[in-house]
Amino acid sequence: MAINIRKTHPLLKIMNHALVDLPAPSNISLWWNFGSLLGLCLIIQILTGLFLAMHYTADISMAFSSVVHICRDVNYGWLIRNIHANGASLFFICIYLHIARGLYYGSYLYKETWNIGVILLFLLMATAFVGYVLPWGQMSFWGATVITNLLSAFPYIGDILVQWIWGGFSVDNATLTRFFAFHFLLPFLILALTVIHLLFLHETGSNNPLGINSNADKISFHPYFSYKDLLGFFIMIFFLATLALFMPNLLGDAENFIPANPLVTPPHIKPEWYFLFAYAILRSIPNKLGGVLALLFSIFILMLVPLLHTSKQRSTIFRPMTQIFFWLLVANFLILTWIGGQPVEQPFMMVGQIASISYFALFLIIMPFAGWCENKILSLN
């Protein structure tokens, strides 16, 4: 009998267990496609970023011009840049949908996998933030100034911390150089953590829409889910191509077409759309330190979700009460995203404050209480 090399070769064996002979639940829906889509996004971002880095100059006198040079003079530079800029937006769309799937179907009960996922989200946000500074436009400069300045809210060490990150007394050449270094380094750290994320996931196996043990009904990953993922790849590449070729500046800020000028402040300083929900939470608290802590907690609250799970059932598929609150959370997230892009005036401030309170209340009080109530209703039957 012929020896199957993919099952015996030390390297191919690892790949085989992860991508070919991996036992997967037979009933996982399209919501389970986003993990592989995130992997594709990461590969696209690393490759396009590598080619951009070959032509980019991390110097405040040349950064803006080098980006213009990439778009005008480099062969298909405009395309590489548009794919990289819009690929970041698609990356965040996929990760938010991936997290929403995890919350809806109770995947967060795989605590190690979930917590590494939250760290991955934080690293992705850090990478996107430092990357947004690199073109050295008006919003790049002022975004960097405002967001890094938030660290000065920490008592005693705040001001020293800000100057240490800036590499001086203002956002200057040293800041841009180190941000470029971080932007180059962090995706590889994300790649390494993704491998660990998968390692922990394959220890337990995937969850499924019913939230029950599916060991009795598993099928091999290839060909069933590899082709299913491939369909997702084509759909995502179609959306990315449409965005990059027809509407490349749809999700950007017009202010960033103006070279950075420390003497002129833009009328509305706001980050990219994928940070707006956290930015709205930050702005809704009048105290600077309180705002910064709320901003951090708005992301790290996800780490508390496994501890706040009170229901006897894992998935929300048979829990209509929790389902309502889940969709309220989704609506709340969208409202916060909208508010984050609006000027700081009434009625936006009030709506932002109500949405911020609702955001934390849904995670910390309402959804755990709904789970407890559902347990009581079940015990009555």
UniProtKB/Swiss-Prot annotation:
GO cellular component: mitochondrial inner membrane; respiratory chain complex III
Annotated positions binding a ubiquinone: 202
Subcellular location: Mitochondrion inner membrane
Membrane topology annotation: Multi-pass membrane protein
GO biological process: mitochondrial electron transport, ubiquinol to cytochrome c
Molecular function GO labels: metal ion binding; ubiquinol-cytochrome-c reductase activity
Cofactor annotation remark: Binds 2 heme b groups non-covalently.
InterPro entries: Cyt_b/b6_C, Cyt_b/b6_C_sf, Cyt_b/b6_N, Cytb/b6-like_sf, Cytochrome_b, Cytochrome_b_C_euk/bac, Cytochrome_b_N_euk/bac, Di-haem_cyt_TM
Binding-site residues, heme b b566: 98, 197
Principal subcellular localization: mitochondrion
Taxonomic superkingdom: Eukaryota
Positions with a binding annotation for heme b b562: 84, 183
Family annotation (Pfam families): Cytochrom_B_C (PF00032), Cytochrome_B (PF00033)
Required co-factors: heme b
Alphabetic keyword roster: Electron transport, Heme, Iron, Membrane, Metal-binding, Mitochondrion, Mitochondrion inner membrane, Respiratory chain, Transmembrane, Transmembrane helix, Transport, Ubiquinone
Membrane-crossing residue ranges in chain numbering: 34-54, 78-99, 114-134, 179-199, 227-247, 289-309, 321-341, 348-368
Family, per entry: Belongs to the cytochrome b family.
Function: Component of the ubiquinol-cytochrome c reductase complex (complex III or cytochrome b-c1 complex) that is part of the mitochondrial respiratory chain. The b-c1 complex mediates electron transfer from ubiquinol to cytochrome c. Contributes to the generation of a proton gradient across the mitochondrial membrane that is then used for ATP synthesis.
Complex and partners: The cytochrome bc1 complex contains 3 respiratory subunits (MT-CYB, CYC1 and UQCRFS1), 2 core proteins (UQCRC1 and UQCRC2) and probably 6 low-molecular weight proteins.
Further comment found in the protein's record: Heme 1 (or BL or b562) is low-potential and absorbs at about 562 nm, and heme 2 (or BH or b566) is high-potential and absorbs at about 566 nm.
UniProt protein name: Cytochrome b
Lineage, top ranks: Eukaryota, Metazoa, Chordata, Craniata, Vertebrata
